């Protein structure tokens, strides 16, 4: 029954394009299920929807139009990804992946009292493992399709440019 409901919800999302506020609300609801510090992740939830200014390296950006969502990513100021989807869950998942990793990394920087400018996290396998574990723990807390996609590595396919 749960599979039918989530399948039906996914089909409904394909027919109805969710707007920025609804996407942000769903992302926030997912993040509240985790143990991640809200004061760190909260400023990053709306960032993917900004339309001007400085675009962070390799971070997700989203434009919404009547045909769906445009997934955008910049590297060194150059747009490297411009891809369409009609699936709101892909947008939510993509933003969750970025926000969860970023929040975990910033939290680790605070724990080790580094600023990532003059001081950096030690290049230590145990630090890397703590980050991986915390990201996995966050997706486990969220569960469902987003946890499945995380373990399948769906972010890589989302960030692969569409064939022309």
Residue ranges and their predicted role:
Residues 25, 29-33, 93-97, 137:
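Charged/polar, solvent-exposed surface patches and flexible loops
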Residues 80, 87-89, 109, 113:
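Generic alpha-helical propensity signal that fires on short helical segments
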Residues 1-61:
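N-terminal "first-domain core" detector
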Residues 17, 82-85:
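Conserved aromatic
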Residues 2-21, 104-164:
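Intrinsically disordered, low-complexity, charge-dense segments enriched in Lys/Arg
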Residues 51-79:
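Short aromatic-glycine-(Arg/Gly/Cys) micro-motifs in beta-strand/loop hairpins
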Residues 5-9, 40, 62, 69-73, ...:
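A generic structural signal for ordered alpha-helices
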Residues 85-104:
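Ampiphathic alpha-helical segments that act as solvent-exposed interaction surfaces
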């Amino acid at each position: 029954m749960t599979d039918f409901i989530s399948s039906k919800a996914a089909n409904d999302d394909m027919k109805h394009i969710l707007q920025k506020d609804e996407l942000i609300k769903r992302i926030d609801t997912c993040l509240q299920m985790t143990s991640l510090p809200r004061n760190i992740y909260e400023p990053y939830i709306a960032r993917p929807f900004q339309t001007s200014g400085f675009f962070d390296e390799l971070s997700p950006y989203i434009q919404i139009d009547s045909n769906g969502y445009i997934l955008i990513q910049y590297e060194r100021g150059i747009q490297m990804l411009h891809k369409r989807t009609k699936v709101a869950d892909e947008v939510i998942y993509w933003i969750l992946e970025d926000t969860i990793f970023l929040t975990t990394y910033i939290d680790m920087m605070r724990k080790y009292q580094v600023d990532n400018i003059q001081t950096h996290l030690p290049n230590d396998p145990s630090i890397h493992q703590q980050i991986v574990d915390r990201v996995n723990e966050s997706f486990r807390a969220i569960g469902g399709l987003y946890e499945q996609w995380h373990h399948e590595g769906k972010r890589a396919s989302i960030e692969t440019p569409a064939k022309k």
